[in-house]
């Protein structure tokens, strides 16, 4: 089940999902029947109807603490008391996101890396209040997707993004020293491929998230 702010955004999201299924068929990863069954399971809504039946709800909205806090407060009104609540944040501490909740024991971080359909790594982030049962449920979910979980504590940037901070900051220092953006990104692309377009990556990721606290 996919929820978003309006039908236009939902339609775009469903198109992307359908394209991923079609691509998997073309690459021989799925049969046409499996892809059709997967598409049939996808539903979309702008309301909270049906979320009371969910075992797991994953938030993947804008990287803004206040907005995420409001969403998690809404989730408490619709989710089952035993449902696992996850955030896909790549850098924000769970304690801040769950600050308005009376009980954060079932809140975890599930940071999927882009493109999600192909990247195997998932950061499983555990907050100070995360219960052992919630952590185990999240771990089993990640494994069921045949992805590689890495368990890390809740801290700014977690594990991968925290290492990435320093790489991106050095790229900005080179830019301040006069190295052109195009030159720097082209050189890093030639050296390390798609993950190395440092300045473009920092811009798309949001500079406000790349400051260690």
Regions from the PLM with identified roles:
Residues 125, 129, 149-213:
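Substrate-binding/catalytic subdomain of NAD(P)-dependent oxidoreductase enzymes
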Residues 3-6, 45, 54, 59-60, ...:
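Generic beta-strand/beta-sheet core signal
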Residues 63-64, 68, 72-82, 131, ...:
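Long hydrophobic segments that form regular secondary structure
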Residues 87-162, 194:
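Rossmann-fold dinucleotide-binding core
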Residues 1-20:
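NAD(P)+-binding Rossmann beta1-loop-alpha1 motif at the extreme N-terminus of oxidoreductases
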Residues 8-12, 23-85, 91-96, 100:
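Rossmann-like NAD(P)-binding element
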Residues 4-5, 35-41, 106-109, 184-189:
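Beta-strand segments within the central parallel beta-sheet cores of soluble alpha/beta enzyme folds
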């Amino acid at each position: 089940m996919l929820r978003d702010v309006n039908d236009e955004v939902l339609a775009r999201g469903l198109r992307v999902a359908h394209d991923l299924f079609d691509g998997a068929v073309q690459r021989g990863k799925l049969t046409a029947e499996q892809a059709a069954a997967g598409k049939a399971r996808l539903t979309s809504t702008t309301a909270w109807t049906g979320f009371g039946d969910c075992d797991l709800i994953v938030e993947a909205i804008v990287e803004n603490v206040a907005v995420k806090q409001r969403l998690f407060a809404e989730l408490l009104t619709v989710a089952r008391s035993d449902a696992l609540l996850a955030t896909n944040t790549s850098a924000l501490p769970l304690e801040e996101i769950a600050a308005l909740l009376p009980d954060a024991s079932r809140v975890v971080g599930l940071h999927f890396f882009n493109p999600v359909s192909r990247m195997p790594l998932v950061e499983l982030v555990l907050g100070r209040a995360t219960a052992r049962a919630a952590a185990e449920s999240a771990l089993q979910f990640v494994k069921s997707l045949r992805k590689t979980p890495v368990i890390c504590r809740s801290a700014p940037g977690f594990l991968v993004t925290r290492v990435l901070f320093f790489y991106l900051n050095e790229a900005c220092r080179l830019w301040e020293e006069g190295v052109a953006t195009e030159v720097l990104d082209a050189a890093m692309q030639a050296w390390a491929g798609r993950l190395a377009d440092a300045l473009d990556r920092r811009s798309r990721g949001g500079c406000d998230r790349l400051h260690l606290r």
